[in-house]
C-alpha cells in the first residue's frame, strides 16, 4: 500500500501531537518533583531554636564568678547571697546628670573623725541582718591596659575610700575611714582583691562598687556618694559605667535603683510596725 502526501501529513501530525502530549506530561511530573524538593529544603534550612547560637536564651538567676581576663561578659554579677555583710552595692549611670565638679553628696549626721569603737550589740545585730538588695556599679577601663594601680589608688582615696577588710576598699561615714560602711569597691578580676604591697605593678580592667541593703542608715545618700565616686573614677581615668547586667548605665537605671531603695525602706518600716 502506497502512502500519498495526505497520508504522510496525517502520520506526521499524529507524531507531533503525541510528542507535545508526552513533553507536557514529562514537564508536569518534573515540576512536582522540584516543588517538593524546594519545600523540603525550605523547612530543612529553618533555624533550630535549641541550637542556634544567635538566639537569646531566657534570663536565669545564676552565680557568676569573676574571670581573670575581662571583657564585657566577664564583669561579676553580685547577688545578696554572694556578698559579705560589709559589701555595699548599687545603681548604674550612663546618662546621669551628675557633673564631675558637683560636690559629693554628704550624709546626714556626719560622724567624728576620731576612731570609735562600735557597740557590740549594734555590731551583732548588723551582722545578723540578711542582705536583701545589692546595688552594683561596674567601672570598665576603655584602655586595654586597664586602670594602673597608683592612679586608681589616688583617685579612690580622694573619694574617701580606705583599704580594709577582705582586702578591698570601703567608704565609711567619715572620710578618715571611721563610722559605718556606706559602700565598698572590689577588683572585678579574680580574686577580687587588691595588694597594696604591689600597687605599683598592679592594674585591672574593671572595678565594682557595691552597696548592700540593709546597710547604711541613710541608703539614698550613701548611694549618691557611691555614684559620684564611680563617675569621678570613670571621668578621670577613662572608664565606662556599667550596671550589674554589663549594660551601659543610664539615668533611668539610676532612678530604678533609687526606687529599689525606697521600696526597701518601705518594707523595713512595715516590718517594724
From Swiss-Prot:
Aminoacyl-tRNA synthetase as UniProt keyword: no
Functional description taken from the UniProt entry: Essential cell division protein that stabilizes the FtsZ protofilaments by cross-linking them and that serves as a cytoplasmic membrane anchor for the Z ring. Also required for the recruitment to the septal ring of downstream cell division proteins.
Bias (Basic and acidic residues) ranges: 111-120
InterPro entries given in the database record: Cell_div_ZipA, ZipA_FtsZ-bd_C, ZipA_FtsZ-bd_C_sf
Periplasmic side, ranges: 1
Primary location group: membrane
Subunit structure: Interacts with FtsZ via their C-terminal domains.
UniProt-annotated stretches for the region Disordered: 65-125
Membrane topology: Single-pass type I membrane protein
Record-stated family: Belongs to the ZipA family.
KW Magnesium (keyword) present: no
Single GO cellular component term: plasma membrane
NCBIfam families: septum_zipA
Compartmental location: Cell inner membrane
Annotated protein name in UniProt: Cell division protein ZipA
Lineage top rank: taxon: Bacteria
Amino acid at each position: 500500500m502506497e502512502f500519498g502526501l495526505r497520508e504522510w501529513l496525517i502520520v506526521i501530525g499524529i507524531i507531533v501531537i503525541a510528542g507535545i502530549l508526552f513533553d507536557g506530561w514529562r514537564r508536569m511530573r518534573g515540576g512536582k518533583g522540584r516543588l517538593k524538593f524546594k519545600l523540603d529544603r525550605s523547612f530543612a534550612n529553618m533555624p533550630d531554636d535549641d541550637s542556634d547560637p544567635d538566639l537569646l536564651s531566657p534570663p536565669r538567676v545564676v552565680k557568676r564568678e569573676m574571670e581573670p581576663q575581662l571583657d564585657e561578659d566577664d564583669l561579676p554579677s553580685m547577688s545578696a547571697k554572694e556578698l559579705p555583710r560589709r559589701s555595699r552595692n548599687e545603681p548604674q549611670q550612663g546618662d546621669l546628670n551628675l557633673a564631675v565638679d558637683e560636690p559629693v553628696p554628704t550624709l546626714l549626721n556626719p560622724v567624728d573623725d576620731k576612731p570609735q569603737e562600735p557597740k557590740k550589740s549594734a555590731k551583732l545585730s548588723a551582722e545578723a541582718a540578711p542582705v536583701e538588695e545589692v546595688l552594683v556599679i561596674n567601672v570598665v577601663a576603655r584602655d586595654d591596659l586597664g586602670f594602673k594601680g597608683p592612679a586608681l589608688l589616688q583617685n579612690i582615696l580622694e573619694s574617701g575610700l580606705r583599704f580594709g577588710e577582705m582586702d578591698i576598699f570601703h567608704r565609711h561615714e567619715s572620710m578618715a575611714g571611721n563610722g559605718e560602711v556606706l559602700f565598698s569597691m572590689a577588683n572585678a578580676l579574680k580574686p577580687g582583691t587588691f595588694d597594696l604591697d604591689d600597687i605599683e605593678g598592679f592594674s585591672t580592667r574593671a572595678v565594682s562598687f557595691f552597696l548592700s541593703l540593709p546597710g547604711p542608715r541613710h541608703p539614698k545618700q550613701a548611694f549618691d556618694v557611691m555614684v559620684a565616686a564611680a563617675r569621678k573614677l570613670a571621668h578621670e581615668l577613662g572608664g565606662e559605667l556599667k550596671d550589674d547586667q554589663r549594660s551601659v548605665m543610664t539615668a533611668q537605671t539610676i532612678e530604678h535603683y533609687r526606687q529599689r531603695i525606697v521600696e526597701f525602706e518601705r518594707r523595713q518600716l512595715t516590718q517594724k510596725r
